[in-house]
Structure formats: C-alpha cells, structure tokens
Amino acid sequence: MLERETMSDQNRLVLAYSGGLDTSVAISYLKERTGKDVVAVSLDVGQGGESLETIKQRALACGAVEAYVVDARDEFANEYCMKALKANAMYEGVYPLVSAISRPLISKHLVRAAHQFGADTISHGCTGKGNDQVRFEVSIASIDPTLKAISPIRDLSLTRDVEIAFAKEHKLPIVQTEKSPFSIDQNVWGRAIETGFLEDPWNGPTKDCYSYTDDPAFPPVEDEVVIEFKQGVPVKIDGHDVTPLQAIEEMNRRAGAQGIGRIDLIEDRLVGIKSRELYEAPGAVALITAHQELENCCLEREQHRIKRDIDKRWAELVYDAQWFSPATQSLNAFIEDTQKYVSGEIRMVLHGGRAVVTGRRSDSSLYDYNLATYDSGDSFDQKSSNGFIDIYGLPSRVAAARDVKFGNGIEVPENSVE
C-alpha cells in the first residue's frame, strides 16, 4: 500500500482525467452532484496527442482545484510492458493486453494523488459494461481498500447528451470537435478500437480504423532488424542501445510501416459478454515474436512447457483485473526466474504484415550444433536411443498386453493391399 502524505483534509475527489469532453464535463458535474472538490489526474503513457501542460490547464479551467500530471512513459514501459513481454502476454492467444496493462499504473497514480491531496473517493470514466471499471476499482482497492470509487457515466447518469447540455449551461471552456464513430484507447504498447459500425461482427474494418499501422497489402521494401535481449528485455536494436520505451517506439514505427500487429477478434470480456475488438500493436507483436523465439533457444524443455501454460494464465489474470493479486505476483516470480538465461540476438524480417524470424544466436542457448547436426561431426550417440525407447515405451506395451488379454486390442485390418 502506498504511504499517505496528505497535504489537506478537505473533502476531495480524484478524477482520472483525459482532457476530452467526457472528463472535462465530469469535473463540474461531479462537484455539483457530490459536493466534493475535484483533483484531475492525467498520465502520459505514450498515447500521443496534446501535451500534459495543455491538459493540466484545461482541467483547471474546467473547475479542478488541483491538476496532477505525470509523464509515465518510461515507468509504463519498464514496469508494465516488459512484464507483459517476458510473459509473452496474449489474451486468448491474440490480444497483447494493450489497455489491461495500463490500468494498474493509472490506478497507482490515482491512489497516490488521493493520498497527496486528501481525497477519499476516486472517479473514472468507464461504463457499466466494460472491463476497465473492474480493472480500475479492483486495482484501487488492492492498493488502498479505504478509498471509494465511482463512475459518473455508470453511477450518475452522465450521458453524452447530458454532457453537451451541461457544458453549454455552465459555459465550460470546451470546444466540441467532430466525434469519432469509434471508442479508442491507445498507449505506447498499442491501440484499441471498438463500437460504431464495428459492433456488427460481419462489417470489415475500414482504413480509417487504423493509425499505428499502414496497409500490409501495400508494404514498403522489407525491413531486416536485429534485436538484442538481456534477461528477457530488449537492450539493443541493430547494435544501438535502447531503453524499453525506445525499443517499443522504434518497433512501433518499423513494424507499423509494414502493417504488422493488426488484430480483429471476438473477445470474451470479464463482465461476461462477447465484444468485437480491433487492435493495433506493431511493436508489441514484433517484440513478443522475437522474445518467444529466443526462449525457444534458451529455456529447458519442461521449463518451457510449464512457462507456456503460465504465460496463458498470466494474460488471463491481468486481463481479469488481477495485476496486484497474490496469484499474479507468484506467477511474476516464476516468469522472472525463467528469464535469467534469455539473452541473445534475434534477426527478423518485417514485411507485409508479418514479422518472420530468420536468425537467432545466444551464448546461453541450449541448442548444441554438435548434438543437432546429421553430418559427420555428430556427437549424439544414436545407439542410446534403443534403451531409451524400451523404457519410454514400457507403459504402452504393458497396457497393450492387457488390452489384448481382454479382447480389446487395436484391430489391424487384414488383406488391406489388393
């Protein structure tokens, strides 16, 4: 739990503030409906758009008594994206947890702001049918169970029509722009697109759905890249040192130019419904592809089998709002231990929507050329396989003998060759 460093005992509320119409109206609306002064909290997790200073000034102009803004890009990349990378996190085998891994970080800063400014309630802008309401509120409760959480959309009937009328009535300094037909959430790890005509799963996505990726049907010349990892973390690209944030940003640019990382699926939401989702995650998909191949080289067979199961469960837990849970923390410990030998280089060709591994090398690889080769330098004693097969096949032979004894042996067709 974060330590409290309260600077005020006023009755305050902390709002997760994006700078858009919804949360700008929510500042005055929450004040009017709850009687609490509002502290606006904004994080930069690589979503682009307006500067934090612009967002801060808008929050204050809309009635916030304080504005807490944080450039959290490196924190997000180092502590959240890299955990997802080490876990090869793909919910339902496809989705790299673009939104799911940002919510615990945002929640942590919401709680920190609540402690700093003396708030007893945290507000978010989630609807009552999405995953994020659960992620925010479970994360907040995991950090500080004494804080309350509300949603103006879910709990206070703040609809779009009410927002516009409220903004006009109160002369809020908001310029309403043309509303996108989609609901979009984005950060440096990727971009999520939903609603609008996409809610009919038969409708194909149009080119205006995409922003992080170019059309893979018309790619530029293929792009060869070498990524060096140290204990599961990318540290160099084409020989140049990179931080985790820089690695993600560069692969977003290069893989995105090739149309890599476009995802279209029907997804099982935590709240029990299925939803149609589009995602763009060029950097995440390319980095996970490279990381998985390096693990193929460096993890022992049984360890690797177990880790694949753990990776799947980790993605499910994080998707299901369990980032801070004891179960996830235990899985983190296992995953981190597996990464101590996951160091080396992966060469990939990026082209036409695909990231294809073409080379791998590692000083800690378990691939032994002398054991694997079929040439004269082979050091594998093939005669050893005779005894291995006898022992390995013993349970099957004993069971087969029992089946034959009781008339249940496997039938072999006779005279099958004419």
Curated annotation (Swiss-Prot):
Tell me, how does this one assemble?
Homotetramer.
| Sites where the protein binds L-citrulline | 95, 131, 135, 183, 267, 279
Enumerate the subcellular locations listed in this protein's record, separating them with semicolons.
Cytoplasm
Reaction(s) this enzyme catalyzes, per UniProt = L-citrulline + L-aspartate + ATP = 2-(N(omega)-L-arginino)succinate + AMP + diphosphate + H(+)
Chief localization class? cytoplasm
* Entry binding sites for ATP: 16-24, 125
Give the protein family.
Answer: Belongs to the argininosuccinate synthase family. Type 1 subfamily.
Question: PROSITE patterns, alphabetically?
Answer: ARGININOSUCCIN_SYN_1, ARGININOSUCCIN_SYN_2
> Under which name does UniProt file this protein?
Argininosuccinate synthase
Record EC number: 6.3.4.5
Task: Give the UniProt keywords, A-Z.
Answer: Amino-acid biosynthesis, Arginine biosynthesis, ATP-binding, Cytoplasm, Ligase, Nucleotide-binding
Molecular function as annotated in GO: argininosuccinate synthase activity; ATP binding
Q: In which pathway does it act?
A: Amino-acid biosynthesis; L-arginine biosynthesis; L-arginine from L-ornithine and carbamoyl phosphate: step 2/3
According to its UniProt entry, one GO biological process term is: L-arginine biosynthetic process
Q: Which InterPro entries match?
A: Arginosuc_syn_C, Arginosuc_syn_N, Arginosuc_synth, Arginosuc_synth_CS, Arginosuc_synth_type_1_subfam, AS_cat/multimer_dom_body, Rossmann-like_a/b/a_fold
Question: What cellular component terms from Gene Ontology apply here?
Answer: cytoplasm
| Residues annotated to bind L-aspartate | 127, 131-132
